[in-house]
Amino acid sequence: MSRHVGVATADIAGQSTKAAKDTRIDPQRDPRWLVPALAVLAIVTTVKLGIRPVSDPDTWWHLKTGAYVLSDWRFDGPDPWVPFSSRPFVLTQWLPEVVAEKGYSVFGLPAVAWLRCAAMLALLSALVWAARQAADAVPAIMAALAGLLGTGGSLSERPQLVSFVLLAITVGAWWKTAGDLRPRWWLAPLTFLWACSHGLWGIGVLIGLTVIGGLALDRRLDRRTAAKLLAVPVLSVAAAALTPVGPRLLLTPFQVSSNAAQFVQEWQPTNVRDIFAAVTLGMIALTLLSWVRGTSARPWWQIALAGTAVVCTLAMSRTIPVGSIIAAPLLASALQEQRGLAATPLTRRGTRAWVGLVAAAAIGAAPIAGAVAQRPSSWPEGLRPQLAAIPAKTVVLNDFSAGGWLMWAEPQLTPVIDLRSEIYSMDYIREYRRTEEVRAGWQGFLDRTKPRYALLKTKAPLTAALREQLSWTTVGTDADYVLLKAP
């Protein structure tokens, strides 16, 4: 059986029997075991990274939002959980939230962990497919695995994973269009699905415009072809406006970023020491090195994609994965050129082999998720009895990142804030930050929100200030959190 799997998987490279036998055509023919080995390595690595307890601070409010959509079928309006919010809560990620909530309601947290792993396998597959538009199986799998590692800082159980998968598909589609100049009309309905899942859908439109602009600079487009290709991003924007949220969806990325850029770390400029940024920039550097050493001029559309990848990587931590995904087929193309051969087309047999391996990995991941993800990781589950005993509607002064978990774990309580920064005024967030850091006037926020309890990090400055200056007492501690009670 292993022999058949090896033969089938090797077919991903699209190498015909004739090419395999003729060393003059293929002087660097890959060993028969290499493609299967790389495929298994990439898939096993992905499963290893994907199966772990649920821990992301955003996961909890995403689950709560999924339940809200299923019960009320509303997509915007006043926030239903935190009375201190002052802006509408627009549900731009409702589709994966609903899927995750349905999985959780049946199988518990292991379903959420498994969905994360399955999405990562889908991302790997989409990266391989995109890279195969530019290279044979060996360089494609290598570039795809590098791209997956570049996204590593954002591979959590959040709807953005859907964005990464659809972005990789979009990049691969436009790479194919750059080769044959045919519009991929299916990108418009794909964008509709994307816009129901996450706010990065606009990056897909940007990729299309970037490739079209590059092709125009390469003088490969006549007016008719250019008009057809431009119709794809135009229709994609129109499709995004047709989601249940409506046309206001087109403006939500700007509304979110206006608040988040100041207060949320992942929206701030990339740290030069970020390991995932280093991986992504390394991918781009290897590509550029190959271009510099090469003898042929690079097409403008590839140069434009490389520039876009650099900008996305350096713009903010949140978009490092975008740069990594864009860079994957560029790296694959550069590696293919080092082989001195034209890339061979992907075959149905190779596709079936890959899909079979990924499906087997996803099935095998299910019982592992059930074993390791029964309880949340890094959250104060040990304080649930004390929290449950607090009277309903009591206001809790919470750690910024713990707001979502508190809403999900103890919905009868009222947190003062959570990570959905777009629903709060900037003045309110600044006032919270002043209190969190115990700066001058910090007690004014307490007068405004009137909390009777606090759920904070054990060593936070605010924890010490509440104890020492206002005589708050400790109710319990767990997982680096402390529950305090006002006198």
Residue positions per predicted region:
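Short hydrophobic alpha-helices at membrane interfaces in multi-pass membrane enzymes
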Residues: A140, A144, K176-F192, A226-A231, ...
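Short periplasmic/luminal acceptor-recognition loop of GT-C membrane glycosyltransferases, typified by
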Residues: I390-I429, D447, P451-K459, L484
